[in-house]
Amino acid sequence: MEGDCLSCMKYLMFLFNFFIFLGGACLLGVGIWVIVDPTGFREIVAANPLLFTGAYIMLAMGAMLFLLGFLGCCGAIRENKCLLLFFFMFILLIFLAELSAAILAFIFRENLTREFFTKELKKHYVRNNDTHVFSSTWNSVMITFACCGVNGPEDFEAVPPLSHLPLEETTPEACCQRKLQSREGMFVNRKACLEGDERFQNRQGCYTVILNSFETYVYLAGALAIGVLAIELFAMIFAMCLFRGIQ
């Protein structure tokens, strides 16, 4: 009976570690996607080290979980006490680090608010300057999502280098409607747009558009993080039980 329980525990631990392996692969994939993202969203928040570093933390955690899941599977199948103990200590450290990161993310969640992005836009944006990384990235986002600023064209009234100009002269070209949403796309009516004709401007703010586009993925990432933490907790319990059961 004891042998059957040990065998069952061994395969359960293998299963949990296989899920850790998959979770690590997912985090690794998301981290790589954020870093190499062709639309350059990372440049928008590059001024905030906490947000910019988050992708690299996710990448590192994904790589460690990927390796850890593989080692856990090997330790369970081979019934190696040394490998199981190493696995338990390592996954405990990762579990505590991830829990700390989740708490910090909750505490600093205001850094992703509408007000934060509006402040950063007004502080760093230079109109129609594609040699300026921050501005070029914002232009790409506005063209791709057919939106303007964080809240709308009025955001550009307070852009420092242009604050002395009327609203219609402060609206960037990137806010003008195009027949095709790309930099190569022809303007519907560029002149009327820059003169302030709202019919040819993208009036909706990018914050709402992007939030609606990525809302599903945000919830998915949160669910994935909770799932990974739960699996790690169960894996630690099974690892210690298996460690004590091996003669």
Swiss-Prot record:
Gene name as annotated? TSPAN18
Tell me one Pfam family matched here: Tetraspanin
Q: Which organism is it from?
A: Gallus gallus (Chicken)
Q: What are the entry keywords?
A: Glycoprotein, Membrane, Transmembrane, Transmembrane helix
| Positions of glycan attachment | 111, 129
Annotated protein name in UniProt: Tetraspanin-18
Record localization: Membrane
Q: Which residues lie on this side of the membrane: Extracellular?
A: 37-49, 104-222
**Membrane-protein topology:** Multi-pass membrane protein
Sequence ranges on the Cytoplasmic membrane side: 1-15, 71-82, 244-247
Listed GO biological process terms: negative regulation of neural crest formation; regulation of sprouting angiogenesis
Q: What induces it?
A: Downrwgulated by FOXD3 during neural crest migration.
Provide the family line. Answer: Belongs to the tetraspanin (TM4SF) family.
CDD domains (alphabetical): uroplakin_I_like_LEL
